[in-house]
């Protein structure tokens, strides 16, 4: 199932709490998933219209040779008349 590639929502930082006010949600997803797949998963699971999908891979921790983060951080912008967190 495609939803298994979404690891968890990110709501633990100050920036992500500010993003929620702008109708943006942050998720950590598998590195193999693409932007169109992310858009499809979010639209089907939450029944919202996704306006934009931005992705980036966070920098790896120092002193860990040979390892990369096994996740990609995604910021999804949804339509303004929808609230996901009630």
Curated annotation (Swiss-Prot):
Signal peptide: none annotated. SUPFAM superfamilies: Ribosomal proteins S24e, L23 and L15e. Gene3D superfamilies: 3.30.70.330. Keywords: Chloroplast, Plastid, Ribonucleoprotein, Ribosomal protein, RNA-binding, rRNA-binding. InterPro entries: Nucleotide-bd_a/b_plait_sf, Ribosomal_uL23-like, Ribosomal_uL23/eL15/eS24_sf. One of its GO terms (cellular component) is chloroplast. GO terms for molecular function: rRNA binding; structural constituent of ribosome. It is found in: Plastid, Chloroplast. One of its GO terms (biological process) is translation. The keyword Transferase does not apply. Pfam families: Ribosomal_L23. The keyword Methyltransferase does not apply. HAMAP family: Ribosomal_uL23_B. Binds to 23S rRNA. Belongs to the universal ribosomal protein uL23 family. Part of the 50S ribosomal subunit. This is Large ribosomal subunit protein uL23c.
